[in-house]
Every structure is written in C-alpha cells, then in structure tokens.
C-alpha cells in the first residue's frame, strides 16, 4: 500500500544520505 511505498522512499533517502556522509568522511 501507500505506507509501504513511503517506507521504501524513506529508506532510499536514508541510504543516499548515509552514502553521502561516508564519501565526505573518506
């Protein structure tokens, strides 16, 4: 449903932020 879709979008956004932070730290 919509809730599952929103959860997937949130996870994608979180993963992007985490990867960006890792690149900055490196």
UniProtKB/Swiss-Prot annotation:
Gene Ontology biological process terms in this record: killing of cells of another organism
Annotated disulfide bonds: none
Tissue expression pattern: Expressed by the venom gland.
Keyword annotations: Antimicrobial, Cytolysis, Secreted, Toxin
GO molecular function, one term: toxin activity
Main location: secreted
UniProt-annotated location(s): Secreted
A GO CC annotation given for this chain: extracellular region
Described purpose of this protein according to its UniProt entry: May have cytolytic and antimicrobial activity.
Full protein name: Oxyopinin-3a
Protein's organism: Oxyopes takobius (Lynx spider)
Source lineage: Eukaryota, Metazoa, Ecdysozoa, Arthropoda, Chelicerata
């Amino acid at each position: 449903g919509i809730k599952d879709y929103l959860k997937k979008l949130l996870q994608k956004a979180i993963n992007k932020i985490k990867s960006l932070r890792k690149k900055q730290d490196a």
